[in-house]
């Protein structure tokens, strides 16, 4: 099912386009430390400007818990947008109310304003109808380009669409196209690389991708629960004991479906979970009882490289080791390079895998770098995202 996009809307000229973006960017001492999500919104903003729209941007930032907290103000985003667009992006002091609506009504074609954080109101996350109606008064048409928040049925992602004609922006369209393609009709061989620390947060994705993949690579902290379920010793590594049976039945199902599962065959371990710990190589599935698994070893990487080289489609979500500690980031870094050099369709999603791709300047070699963390996960789990559902044709 495809979605309606900005190209399906007749005329934006002179109209206020209320654009829901995902400007939930990391801030360090009030400065934006990664502007990927802001840059991802630019194609839609530029298109609307070209078409003569008056652009009213809305977003959330952080978790202010329904109260006005200037620590979570979108002011730094307005400054960054002004710089990137080469025009003044006016920051308004609220997101609802007569004064704000009057400001939007006085805009000229091509003007861009940013409203204050929608999560300064508790009604936003409750998808309160009255709040959604007040938000909608700032626009004549609603454009949802916030894929990163599409899995949330909030007032600014879903509620507003009850009051305004609604279409998706280019980012929303791109995410829906690439992730949808992978789930519906992937070119084969199709390799899913799933990392991260917990089985509990990734098991639904693994189960959804299992029936579609030819190879599933499991890495990161969650791999140790899978190894334990096969009878290997994992030392002091992370173990989710309540998921041992689930891991075991997943591996059994993979065998029945003739899907190859790659688990770590060797490890980089440490005495304790610390960025200053000394890395030590273990050439075995088994980890000594006083050690913690921190990254995959060279043999595992060679196995992964073999399947990546012949892959026609790759989806990668989650790191293969403790990526945030430099000494244990090699596995994730090498997989990032392997995925980037693959000639097939490559999709990377999830905070740490995206960070790895960006850190090594490889994002332009990936077919699609997904901007949605939780949203990408839920999409890959096969869930219908509320923010996308309201845009379907």
Curated annotation (Swiss-Prot):
Domain of life, per lineage: Bacteria
BP GO terms, sorted: gluconeogenesis; glycolytic process
Family: Belongs to the phosphoglycerate kinase family.
Gene symbol of the encoding locus: pgk
Catalytic activity: (2R)-3-phosphoglycerate + ATP = (2R)-3-phospho-glyceroyl phosphate + ADP
EC number: 2.7.2.3
Protein's UniProt keywords contain Metal-binding: no
Name under which the protein is recorded: Phosphoglycerate kinase
């Amino acid at each position: 099912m495809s979605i309606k996009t900005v190209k399906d809307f007749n005329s934006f000229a002179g109209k206020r386009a209320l654009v829901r973006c995902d400007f939930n960017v990391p801030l360090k001492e009030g400065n934006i430390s990664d502007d990927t999500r802001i840059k991802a919104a630019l194609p839609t903003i530029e298109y609307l400007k070209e078409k003569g729209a008056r652009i009213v941007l809305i977003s959330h930032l952080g978790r202010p818990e329904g109260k006005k907290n200037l620590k979570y103000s979108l002011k730094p985003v307005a400054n960054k947008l002004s710089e990137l667009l080469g025009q003044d992006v006016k920051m308004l002091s609220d997101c609802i109310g007569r004064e704000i609506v009057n400001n939007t009504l006085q805009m000229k074609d091509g003007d861009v304003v940013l409203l204050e954080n929608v999560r300064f109101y508790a009604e936003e996350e409750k998808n309160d109808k009255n709040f959604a109606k007040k938000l909608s008064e700032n626009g004549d048409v609603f454009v949802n380009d916030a894929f990163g928040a599409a899995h949330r049925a909030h007032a600014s992602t879903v509620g507003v669409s009850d009051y305004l004609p609604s279409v998706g922006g280019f980012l929303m369209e791109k995410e829906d196209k690439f992730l949808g393609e992978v789930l519906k009709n992937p070119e084969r061989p199709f390799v899913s690389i799933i990392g991260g620390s917990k089985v509990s947060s990734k098991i639904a994705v693994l189960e959804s991708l299992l029936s579609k993949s030819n190879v599933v690579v499991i890495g990161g902290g969650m791999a140790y629960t899978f190894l334990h379920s096969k009878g290997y010793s994992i030392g002091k590594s992370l173990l989710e004991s309540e998921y041992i049976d689930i891991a075991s039945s997943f591996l059994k199902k993979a065998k029945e479906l003739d899907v190859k599962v790659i688990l770590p065959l060797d490890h980089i371990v440490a005495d304790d979970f610390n960025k200053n710990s000394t890395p030590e190589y273990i050439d075995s599935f088994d980890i000594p009882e006083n050690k913690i698994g921190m990254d995959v070893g060279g043999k595992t990487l060679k196995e992964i490289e073999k399947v990546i080289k012949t892959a026609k489609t790759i989806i990668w979500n989650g790191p293969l080791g403790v990526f945030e500690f430099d000494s244990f980031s090699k596995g994730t870094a090498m997989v990032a390079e392997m995925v980037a050099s693959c000639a097939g369709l490559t999709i990377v999603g999830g905070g740490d895998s995206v960070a790895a791709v960006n850190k090594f300047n490889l994002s332009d070699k990936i077919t699609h770098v997904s901007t949605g963390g939780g949203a990408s996960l839920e999409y890959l789990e096969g869930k219908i995202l509320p923010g996308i559902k309201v845009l379907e044709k």
